[in-house]
From Swiss-Prot:
Role this protein plays: Probably involved in ribonucleotide reductase function.
Name of the protein this chain belongs to: Protein NrdI
Gene3D superfamilies assigned to the protein according to its UniProt record, in alphabetical order: 3.40.50.360
Annotated GO biological process: protein modification process
Family designation: Belongs to the NrdI family.
Top-rank taxon, per record: Bacteria
Single Gene Ontology MF annotation: FMN binding
Family annotation (InterPro entries): Flavoprotein-like_sf (IPR029039), RNR_Ib_NrdI_bac (IPR020852), RNR_NrdI (IPR004465)
Provenance organism: Serratia proteamaculans (strain 568)
Amino acid sequence: MNPLVYFSSSSENTHRFVEKLSLPAMRIPIAGARSKLLMETPYILIVPSYGGGSAVGAVPIQVIRFLNDPQNRAFLRGVIAAGNTNFGAAYGIAGDIIAKKCQVPFLYRFELLGTTQDVANVRQGVTAFWQRQN
């Protein structure tokens, strides 16, 4: 199965969610300038949403840098976003922004650490997505 690629800040919320998935995953480094992740296969991106409900600053800078690499952008096949429902329409907005800009499907959104149901939905959805791609 193709990997997930994710970013998680020092809060580790997204990291903990990805660990629960028990799927192959690679992490975008927090200190992006010191170590670079370069993808060589198609992947699905899992990204937290920042910015407190605003589109400005919603996509973490490390993710922007990662996707600014043409090779990484070329292998992106879909996006999943974490967010906070307190932000209303901006809940998981980083996923909306990336999906639109990179022209890939926005596959799922979950709140903060995600629920047991979110984990099951993402695991099943990712598996089905890759089966349809192959």
